[in-house]
């Protein structure tokens, strides 16, 4: 089984295209993680999209445990054909082995820890925390392979790279964070115009740097010089 975590805010942009080749001929479970940060109507729409492709789908909030209780049952259901084949061969109670994959900072380790009910995998609010593969035994029925998050070498669409930067899947060291903040302000102003005034008490402006300065001033982040 391949368990693929995607960010519910950008489900397509947060999918490594190489995973489809990796998961060929294997049962697939897509987790719309951080579903609490996306709108319900879009979570439902994307769940239907992946189901139409033949994947099992669960909307989860790994940090708060939302949707986690249903996962082990979904895993067993997704692997029922293999479990039945094993049973006919006289192999009983063999644990399901599942690979957990996804891009950096999508929440794989947080998901594994939530599912296990204890800290099994190292977590952090930045990309690249998991450095190597490790098997984690949840119980007698399920074993998970935690894998490092990997981005693909080249983005065909520049907008994909921008979205990944917005959600923290790229290291700040390789980004111009001021330009990135301005791009995010432009995006929010276009598609979610109420967010910035509600969150940061700022007035809309066509120049994103004016808004950025307002936010910095309101948060006492402006230095003299």
Regions found by a protein language model. Give the residues of each.
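Conserved active-site beta-strand-loop modules that form the wall/rim of enzyme catalytic pockets
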Residues: 62, 112, 142-145
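Glycine-rich phosphate-binding P-loop
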Residues: 97-117, 121, 147
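Anionic group-transfer/hydrolysis microenvironments
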Residues: 6-9, 35, 115, 148
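Residue-level signature of catalytic and energy-coupling elements of molecular machines
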Residues: 7, 50, 111, 146-147
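Helix-rich effector regions associated with P-loop NTPase G domains
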Residues: 1, 8-28, 41, 56, ...
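Canonical P-loop GTPase G-domain recognition
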Residues: 27-29, 35-102, 120
